Amino acid sequence: MNEAFELFSKNIKDRLETNVKGEVTIWFVDDELHIKIYNHGLKFRIVFQNLTAMVVYGRMVPDRIVEEVLGKYRAFIMNKYFN
């Protein structure tokens, strides 16, 4: 894992854990970026697939969490790690 990704993943993990008051795990699988969030009994994954599409797995995912990832990080993730 390169240094830039380590710094990025720590930054997004810290931000998300603060904003959602939950546990956040981030990892890569091939060309997919996975963000798993466990929050007050809700567990879900946000996966950036095929470099452009985003899929959310889980039920009752709070809109503010999805917006946090989409609004703040989606463009950065795509530009920094997939271009």
Regions inferred by a protein language model and the residue ranges of each:
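Negatively charged, low-complexity tracts enriched in Asp/Glu with abundant Ser/Thr
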Residues: 1-28, 56-71, 75
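Acidic, low-complexity, intrinsically disordered interaction modules
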Residues: 25-64
